């Protein structure tokens, strides 16, 4: 991954996790929130850092750190971004085979709501693997939300602004019974 500058967000993790971030800092920029501020705020912190310190950046890839995204898929999203820099690139999982019920349920509900609200069909609204041009940083920073709602708001705002979506099929990875996901259907 020599062409990538990696930014890791420590979003208020406990002291017991500090060795993980110290190890990450050997190969990445680690930005820290002293208290948990939410996924959306973490993404915005990274975007603000890029805007201020990495002005030569051409594109941004966002990947969750929950073990559900393979390096190969991150690279495929990056390649799609190079060929379609005017679109929001989404690494979309194919929900077939043994998929945890809460994942299938959650994605089906949000797909329906998003399609109804935005008039655009997306196969995986909950994907944490996305890419976009650095030209969109100011726009992304203006999207409302500091927690998980930021990602859905990002999709809604992109649809409203006429930013098209480009889906890249990615492998569906679940660890255990999907304990790494924080989606709660109730």
Regions found by a protein language model. Give the residues of each.
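Hydrophobic helical membrane-anchoring modules
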Residues: 23, 143-186
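Short loop->beta transition adjacent to catalytic acidic/histidine clusters or analogous donor-positioning motifs
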Residues: 1-7, 28-29, 58
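Short beta-strand-to-loop acidic/aromatic patch adjacent to the donor-nucleotide binding site
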Residues: 56-68
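Acceptor/aglycone-binding surface of glycosyltransferases and processive sugar-polymer synthases
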Residues: 29, 34-37, 41-49, 71-148, ...
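Conserved beta-strand segments of alpha/beta enzyme cores
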Residues: 5, 29-30, 121, 164-166
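Residue-level signature of catalytic and energy-coupling elements of molecular machines
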Residues: 46, 66, 133, 158, ...
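A conserved acidic beta->alpha catalytic loop
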Residues: 10-18, 67
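Short, high-confidence coil segments that cap the C-terminus of an alpha-helix
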Residues: 55-57, 84-88, 163
